[in-house]
A protein has these predicted regions:
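Core dinuclear metal-dependent hydrolase active-site scaffold
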Residues: 1-43, 114-170, 253-257
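Structural motif
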Residues: 26, 50, 153-157, 181, ...
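Active-site flanking residues adjacent to catalytic metal/cofactor-binding acidic residues
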Residues: 28, 54, 157-159, 184, ...
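Active-site metal-binding motif and surrounding structural segment of the metallo-beta-lactamase
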Residues: 31-86, 177-182
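Short, well-ordered amphipathic alpha-helices
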Residues: 35-39, 64-72, 97-102, 200-210
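Alpha-helix termini
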Residues: 42-43, 70-81, 103-109, 174-176, ...
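Metallo-beta-lactamase
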Residues: 80-143, 246-251
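Cap/insert and terminal regions of metallo-dependent hydrolase folds
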Residues: 162-253
């Protein structure tokens, strides 16, 4: 209750909804809070036809909104844009979507195309190249993080994972990947990491990437997937991680690389 009271008083960047990311017109994960996020950040979801999922946890896989997009209630969008909704994810993501769709007689499956993705097998969406990597998270499925490239810059999108598995680090080193931006999970805050990272694991990952020459002195480091487990509100945690040279993300943050 103390955290909630502080947030209600201070508002601003302290108000944190559940994470998802828009890169150009590709959405990574679909938050249960997507409606308010789009209103607050002035995002037009009718322009988004590609969804890429990291895993099937409900704070990332919002099946209800997917169904809305595939139903007649989205007829205005369909008249405006006849493109099929392209969805990328693992088997568990596909199963989660199909389970909900099976209960909705109004869904038009011709409006959706699912692409099964696997670790270390790159795929392209327009000018963006995605390379899925193995995450340490939701251990009953192949949870993923991503290397994302646009031909000019390279992002490590490592949100919702604990310390990266050795096979993921080995792949990064063997492929000689250089990151311009690194975005890391920081759900655990000052606590020890588990299937999420905290600040200790954030520092350790940065050092591993440095030793592998996968980053440069100009690489920017963002901490994302912040939660109440951090033990402090965002502006307090922001000061702490800032001492380590990290930037804490917030709702509506826009990064240009």
């Amino acid at each position: 209750m103390l955290f909630r009271s502080k947030v209600r008083t201070l508002l601003g960047k302290n108000v944190k909804t559940r994470s998802c990311t828009l890169i150009d017109q590709v959405m990574i994960d679909l938050s249960p809070d997507i409606f308010s996020q789009c209103i607050n950040s002035h995002v037009d979801l009718s322009e988004v036809n590609h969804l890429v999922f990291t895993h099937s946890h409900s704070d990332h896989l919002n099946t209800t909104e997917i169904c809305f997009r595939l139903r007649e209630m989205a007829s205005v969008i369909q008249k405006k844009d006849k493109k099929v909704m392209e969805i990328y994810g693992n088997d568990a993501v596909q199963d989660g979507i199909m389970e909900i769709i099976a209960k909705d007689p109004h869904v038009d499956l011709t409006r959706m195309r699912f692409h099964r993705i696997q670790k270390f097998e790159p795929f392209r969406i327009g000018h963006l190249k995605f390379t899925p990597l193995k995450a340490y998270h939701k251990l009953d499925e192949e949870a993923l993080i991503f290397v994302i490239e646009d031909g000019r810059s390279t992002l490590l999108y490592a949100n919702d994972t604990g310390a990266l598995p050795e096979e993921t680090l080995d792949f990064i080193e063997q492929q000689n990947i250089k990151f311009d931006v690194v975005s890391m999970d920081t759900s655990r805050g000052i606590l020890d990491g588990d299937t999420h990272m905290g600040i200790r694991e954030n520092v350790e990952l940065r050092e591993k990437l440095r030793r592998m020459h996968a980053v440069t002195p100009d690489t920017e480091y963002y901490l994302n997937h912040y939660s109440h487990m951090c033990g402090m509100i965002p502006q307090e945690y922001e000061r702490l991680v800032g001492q380590e040279g990290f930037l804490l993300t917030y709702d509506g943050l826009s990064v240009t690389v």
